[in-house]
Each structure stands twice: as structure tokens, then as C-alpha cells.
């Protein structure tokens, strides 16, 4: 079975509500998101369809569960939370459009999402212009919350950064798995994957036997994997999303490659195992900000129980971070 390299223990869940106290100096749009009406309007900008819909759907579930609990408890300062949801279709341009619509047309007070770094980067430009805060549960690209002028005033996250994942993968492979020689195989079309790969190269103490890339949407990895098969190495480090890495893992195992495979939080969905095949997902390790294999607080245990009751499935990292 695959194993999680857990970085964050869910000892306590907190529902975070962000309201901008003032407008950014570069506000150029007619957003009224700082004005609270009869309800507190929370925009949800998520990947509900498209390539990485599994992330967005899990986060939407976590958000809905949190809002239901808050509203049943009386809301915030006596006001109920109201969700306004947009599907960004796993497309960066659509993520920007969704944020614009939520801020300008729907006049939300804050936006949760998107889930993926590229979509967050696009959507965050809208928040910086309108002053409507954006909170991403899982956008890990290092520069999402900072720019040349320092920390962005209206962009927040509840997860770790790509550079941290790269450090963890470098340390875990070398120290825990005793992998002194690795193959580095990553998605060159993804800033997320490239950021993790770059940090891994800076931090890894062993030898990178070969470095190769694939692109989002690829389906056939036989050529690269066949080359890897005859090399002398201890593990494959594979930054990318489950949409590709699940397929790569299956094809690698089918070719007889049984070396450990390590990846980032992009592996952290049941779809990875579905694409790889359950028997092929053994000796696989990935970074996660969530695990049930640690001591949990009453709040965390309550979340898991409530999530199972509401959705008839276990929550994953993305659901937990959004909650």
C-alpha cells in the first residue's frame, strides 16, 4: 500500500473567516466584498470538473461540512454563512473568470479556492485588485502569497509550500529509504511539479542518476520508463499530479520496475490508486498534510466521523484542509 509522509498533524481544525478591513491601493474593480449583508457570502472557486476534479470535489465537501456546522451553531456574529460556488473546470483562465464573477457580480466577502497552484496564481490577481480575500486550501506554489513587494495582502493558504515538499522528499528518500541514487521524473508543464523538483535537486544529498520530464495530459510513458529500467538507482522521485503519476506508476510496475516511488501531495487522492491499480500502489510514498495514523484531537476525530456520515467515504487531505 502507499504510505504518507505526514507533515502536519490534524490536532485541531479551525474554521477561518477572512474579511478585508480595507481596500488594497491597487483596487481597480467595483467589488463590494467587504460589505456584509444579511448573510456572510463565501465564494467557492473550485476544480469541480476537468482534469483534477477529484481535488476540487473533496475540498467542496469539506467546505460544505464546515459551513453546515457553523450555521447550525448560529453562524458568525449571528449571521449565517452562504456559499456561492463556481466551477473553474480545472482551467487557469476559468479560475480567474470565476474569481472575477464571485467578487464583482456575486459580491462575496471572501473566496475559498482554487485547489491547484496554477489556478490560484490566476485567481489571486483578482483578489489583489478587488480586495476580496482568497484562501486556498491546497495551493502550494511558493510565490502564491508573496510578490516583489512582499506578502500579498489578500492571498492566504492553509497548507505547506512546494519548496518544503522538495526538502521533505530529499530528506526522506536519502535518510529513511536509504536511497542514495534516484531517478528524478517530473511534470515539466506544471510550475507546481517544477518547483518541487528544483528544491529536491538543491537539497538531495545523493546522486540523481538521470533527470527526465513528462507533460500534463501525457498517457504513454513507456519510452522513458524503459530507459529507467536498466539504470542503477534506488528510487524514483516523481513530482506531479495523480492524473499522470497514477498512470506512470501502473506502467512502471507493468514493466517490472519495483523500486520505491516518491511523490508530493499531488498523489494524495484515491484516484491515484485507481489509476495505478491497488497492487501497483505498494512501495509508494507521498507527502501529506493529513493522516489518521496519528493521535487525533476530539475535533479532528469528530470531523472524520461527520465527513463519513455526510459523504459515505473517508476524507482525504484536500477535504481536511478545506474544512
Label each region the model flagged:
Residues 25-46, 72-80, 174-180:
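Immediate post-signal peptide segment of exported/extracytoplasmic ligand-binding proteins
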Residues 33-62, 86-93, 115-116, 185-194, ...:
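Extracytoplasmic "Venus flytrap"
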Residues 48, 152-216, 235:
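An alpha-beta-alpha
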Residues 95, 157-181, 194, 220-222, ...:
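Hydrophobic alpha-helical segments within soluble ligand-binding/sensing domains
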Residues 106-115, 135-137, 181-186, 232-242, ...:
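Periplasmic-binding protein-like
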Residues 252-323:
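Extracellular/periplasmic periplasmic-binding protein-like sensory domains
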Residues 25-31, 54-61, 73-146, 214-221, ...:
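Beta-alpha junction/loop-to-helix N-cap segments that form part of ligand/metal-binding clefts
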Residues 17-20:
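C-terminal motif of bacterial Sec signal peptides marking the signal peptidase cleavage site
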Amino acid at each position: 500500500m502507499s504510505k504518507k509522509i505526514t507533515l502536519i498533524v490534524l490536532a485541531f481544525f479551525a474554521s477561518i473567516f477572512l474579511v478585508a478591513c480595507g481596500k488594497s491601493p491597487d483596487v481597480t474593480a467595483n467589488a463590494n466584498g467587504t460589505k456584509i449583508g444579511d448573510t456572510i457570502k463565501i465564494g467557492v472557486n473550485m476544480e469541480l470538473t476537468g482534469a483534477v476534479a477529484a481535488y476540487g470535489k473533496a475540498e467542496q465537501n469539506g467546505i460544505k461540512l464546515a459551513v453546515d456546522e457553523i450555521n447550525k451553531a448560529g453562524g458568525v456574529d449571528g449571521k449565517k454563512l452562504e456559499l456561492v460556488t463556481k466551477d473553474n473546470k480545472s482551467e487557469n483562465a476559468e479560475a480567474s473568470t470565476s474569481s472575477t464573477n464571485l467578487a464583482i457580480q456575486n459580491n462575496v466577502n471572501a473566496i475559498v479556492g482554487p485547489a491547484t497552484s496554477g489556478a490560484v496564481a490566476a485567481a489571486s490577481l483578482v483578489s489583489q485588485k478587488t480586495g476580496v480575500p482568497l484562501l486556498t486550501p491546497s495551493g502550494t506554489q511558493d510565490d502564491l502569497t508573496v510578490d516583489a513587494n512582499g506578502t500579498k495582502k489578500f492571498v492566504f493558504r492553509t497548507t505547506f509550500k512546494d519548496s518544503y515538499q522538495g526538502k521533505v522528499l530529499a530528506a526522506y528518500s536519502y535518510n529513511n529509504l536509504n536511497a542514495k541514487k534516484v531517478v528524478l521524473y517530473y511534470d515539466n508543464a506544471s510550475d507546481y511539479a517544477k518547483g518541487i523538483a528544483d528544491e529536491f535537486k538543491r537539497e538531495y544529498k545523493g546522486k540523481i542518476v538521470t533527470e527526465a520530464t513528462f507533460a500534463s495530459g501525457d498517457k504513454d510513458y513507456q519510452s522513458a520508463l524503459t530507459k529507467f529500467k536498466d539504470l542503477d538507482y534506488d528510487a524514483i522521485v516523481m513530482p506531479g499530479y495523480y492524473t499522470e503519476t497514477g498512470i506512470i506508476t501502473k506502467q512502471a510496475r507493468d514493466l517490472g520496475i519495483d523500486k520505491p516511488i516518491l511523490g508530493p501531495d499531488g498523489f494524495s487522492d484515491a484516484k491515484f490508486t485507481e489509476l495505478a491499480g491497488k497492487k501497483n500502489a505498494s512501495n509508494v510514498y507521498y507527502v501529506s498534510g493529513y493522516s489518521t495514523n496519528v493521535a487525533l484531537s476530539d475535533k479532528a476525530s469528530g470531523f472524520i466521523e461527520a465527513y463519513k456520515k455526510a459523504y459515505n467515504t473517508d476524507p482525504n487531505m484536500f477535504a481536511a484542509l478545506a474544512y
